UniProtKB/Swiss-Prot annotation:
InterPro entries: SmpB, SsrA-bd_prot, SsrA-bd_prot_CS
Family: Belongs to the SmpB family.
Superkingdom classification of source: Bacteria
Protein name: SsrA-binding protein
Gene name of the record: smpB
Length: 156
């Protein structure tokens, strides 16, 4: 069986772009159990409530939902268990210094397979206030309306 190549997206966190101001992004590997990989290959995962945090000098992904593998047996994984993120030491140090600043957190943006290996894209993020969210929605609506008006003018 030939190896997979390219990027196959399993799950995206669309809510993160609405809830946070996103900064630097990093690609991290995931330390997974076999049944988790099989469940991901079926395209089953949810990143909505996920976040990453440091325990000691290691980075862990928490609250990401990967449901149990349907054909799994007694050795199935726990759906919301903590999963270790695999990054280079220099990246870990850089991220840890940035997350110590007030208000910064790490959120997963995308979970995918790259050349057969499970990867997660995490971003350094700062929470938006309610008025920021409303302002962003208002701006998106204004651009949609202006594009619609331009299209009608050009067609009509």
């Amino acid at each position: 069986m030939p190896k997979e190549s390219g990027r196959k997206v399993v799950a995206t966190n669309r809510k993160a772009r609405h809830e946070y101001h996103l900064g630097d992004t990093y690609e991290a590997g995931l330390a997974l159990m076999g049944t988790e990989v099989k469940s991901l290959r079926e395209g089953r995962a949810n990143l909505t409530d996920g976040f990453a945090t440091f325990y000691g000098d290691e980075l862990w992904l928490e609250a990401v939902y990967i449901p149990e593998y349907l054909n799994g047996s007694w050795n199935n994984h726990s759906a919301r268990r903590r999963r270790k993120l695999l990054l280079h030491r220099a990246e870990l140090i850089k991220i840890s210094h940035k997350t110590r600043e007030a208000g910064f957190t790490l959120v997963p943006l995308q979970l995918y397979f790259l050349d057969g290996k499970a990867k997660v894209e995490i971003a350094l993020a700062k929470g938006k206030r309610d008025y920021d969210k409303r302002q962003a929605l208002r701006e998106a609506q204004d651009t949609r309306e202006s594009l619609r008006a331009m299209r009608e003018k050009n067609l009509g």
